[in-house]
Curated annotation (Swiss-Prot):
Encoding gene (name): nusG
SMART domains reported for this sequence: KOW, NGN
One Gene Ontology biological process: regulation of DNA-templated transcription elongation
One annotated Gene Ontology cellular component of this protein: cytosol
Designated name of the protein: Transcription termination/antitermination protein NusG
Gene3D superfamilies: 2.30.30.30, NusG, N-terminal domain
Sorted UniProt keywords: Transcription, Transcription antitermination, Transcription regulation, Transcription termination
Entry similarity comment: Belongs to the NusG family.
Source organism superkingdom: Bacteria
Record-linked PROSITE patterns: NUSG
Length: 185
């Protein structure tokens, strides 16, 4: 019986463990090695799950990007012996998550898991299954204004401007499509 929620064993998203703080270096090195060893058709994408945090520094608000999973990097790849070897032997990579040692192949992430991570990062825009138009009231589901309801005042490609009422003032907020949902009547 086949589980349709699983990505094919040969191709999928895998989690590699790295030394904490070396995630960006591992990503750069892995992409370089994929090109160098003609493995770009096997090592397809490398992502570091991050989120943007607003924090106050010296009395000023600043946006800082933080790793969601320090010490881990996501790799979309065709799992061949050669691709496994290139990834596993990249400097600062300590191994694959879901591998049981002795060169055993790791288990890929479930499709829904990777979609949730990528949507959260803004790398994949979830499908909007309702009409989006100027004047429509929607609910914000992601970001600092999550939970607020507001009308759409402008549409520019995949970006929306909503006018959020805060403290009696109309505040324009720019969002991506994946950050809103329809308000059910």
């Amino acid at each position: 019986m086949e589980d349709n929620n699983l990505v094919s064993f040969d191709q999928g998203w895998f989690v590699i463990q790295t030394y904490a703080g070396y995630e960006r270096k591992v990503k750069e090195d892995l992409l370089e090695r994929a090109e160098l060893y003609n493995m770009a058709d096997k090592i397809l994408r490398v992502e570091i799950p991050t989120e943007t945090i607003r924090t106050e520094v010296n009395g000023k608000m600043k946006e800082v990007e933080e790793n969601l999973f320090p010490g881990y990097v996501l790799v979309e790849m065709n799992m061949t012996d050669e691709a496994w070897f290139i990834v596993r032997n990249t400097p600062n990579v300590t191994g694959f998550v879901g591998s049981h040692g002795n060169r055993s192949k790791p288990t890929p992430l479930f499709e829904q898991e990777i979609q949730d991570i990528l949507v959260g990062m803004g790398k994949v825009v979830r499908e909007i299954d309702f009409d989006v138009f100027v004047g429509k009231r929607v609910r914000i589901v992601d970001g600092a204004f999550s939970g607020f309801e507001a009308p759409i005042t402008e549409i520019n490609g995949d970006k929306l401007t909503l006018t959020v009422d805060m403290f009696g003032r109309a505040t324009p907020v720019e969002l991506d499509m994946h950050q809103i949902e329809d308000i059910q009547a």
